[in-house]
Amino acid sequence: MDAVAVYHGKISRETGEKLLLATGLDGSYLLRDSESVPGVYCLCVLYHGYIYTYRVSQTETGSWSAETAPGVHKRYFRKIKNLISAFQKPDQGIVIPLQYPVEKSSPRSTQGTTGIREDPDVCLKAP
């Protein structure tokens, strides 16, 4: 799981929410450990100022699945990256497609509210 750039490990729900809200972009998402269910992960997605959380778990055979909206057929994936790719498409049982990954390695101090990285060493001067 550590190889997945959007996996933040054992961060609190509140910390995850702050990271997502800081982007200000609907469709921003990250993965974190569940605080209430050991061995389960949470896929957290920002939409209209709210954070929607979907439980992601691995079966005994190693397949990955996510709890989605009621009535949506549960799908299984060989790799967590395949699950994320599938949920980047519309109508997959989550509130909005995954669009903007919030990566653990992203330097928070250089991440603007637009979600676009700004290089603090680059300055443009008007003529």
Swiss-Prot record:
Residue span(s) of domain SH2: 6-102
UniProt keyword Oxidoreductase, yes or no: no
PTM-bearing positions, type N6-acetyllysine: 89
Localisation per UniProt entry: Cytoplasm
A Gene Ontology cellular-component term: cytoplasm
Keywords: Acetylation, Adaptive immunity, Cytoplasm, Immunity, Innate immunity, SH2 domain
Keyword Acetylation part of the UniProt annotation: yes
Superkingdom per UniProt: Eukaryota
Biased composition (Basic and acidic residues): 116-127
GO biological processes: adaptive immune response; cell-cell signaling; cellular defense response; innate immune response; regulation of immune response; regulation of signal transduction
Location of the region described as Interaction with FYN SH3 domain in the Swiss-Prot/TrEMBL record: 67-92
Matching InterPro entries: SH2 (IPR000980), SH2_dom_sf (IPR036860), SH2_prot_1A (IPR017289), SH2D1A_SH2 (IPR035876)
Pfam families: SH2
Region called Disordered, residue ranges: 104-127
Role description: Cytoplasmic adapter regulating receptors of the signaling lymphocytic activation molecule (SLAM) family such as SLAMF1, CD244, LY9, CD84, SLAMF6 and SLAMF7. In SLAM signaling seems to cooperate with SH2D1B/EAT-2. Initially it has been proposed that association with SLAMF1 prevents SLAMF1 binding to inhibitory effectors including INPP5D/SHIP1 and PTPN11/SHP-2. However, by simultaneous interactions, recruits FYN which subsequently phosphorylates and activates SLAMF1. Positively regulates CD244/2B4- and CD84-mediated natural killer (NK) cell functions.
Subunit (UniProt): Interacts with CD84, CD244, LY9, SLAMF1 and FYN. Interacts with NTRK1, NTRK2 and NTRK3.
Protein name: SH2 domain-containing protein 1A
Source organism (scientific name): Saguinus oedipus (Cotton-top tamarin)
